[in-house]
Amino acid sequence: VGTKKPNPWGLYDMHGNVAEWTLDQYIPTAYNQRETKVKNPYEIPTKTYPRTVRGGAWTDAAQRLRSAARRPSSSKWKKRDPQIPKSKWWHTDAPFVGFRIVRPVEVPSPEEQKKYWSYESN
C-alpha cells in the first residue's frame, strides 16, 4: 500500500484488478446535476440498488480502466449467494467488483452514522 506515487489529487493505489463498489446511490445524470465545483459529491442512498461502481476491472475494455468510469450495481450480482438472508457485502456473481476500506479522520456522531447507514433498513 502506498508504494507508488499518488495521483494528481494525492490519492494512492486507485487502480487495481477490480472496480470499486461504493456506498453512493447510482444516479445516471449525477454529473449533469452538479454545480461547477463540488467538495463532497456523495449521493446519500435511498435504497440498496443501484449503487455506484467506479473504475475498471480485469474484465473491462481499456476505456473503462479509469477512476471516472461509473456503472450501476445490480442485485443479480448476489444471485448465487447461499446465505439466508443474503449478504449485504458479498457479490457472488461479480468477481470484477471489490471495495475499499476507508474511515473518517474524526468519528461521526451517532446521528451521522445512522443517516449514513440508514439505507440498510429500507
Description of each model-found segment:
Residues 3, 14-122:
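Surface-exposed recognition segments
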Residues 6-9:
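Short loop/turn microsegments at loop-to-beta-strand junctions
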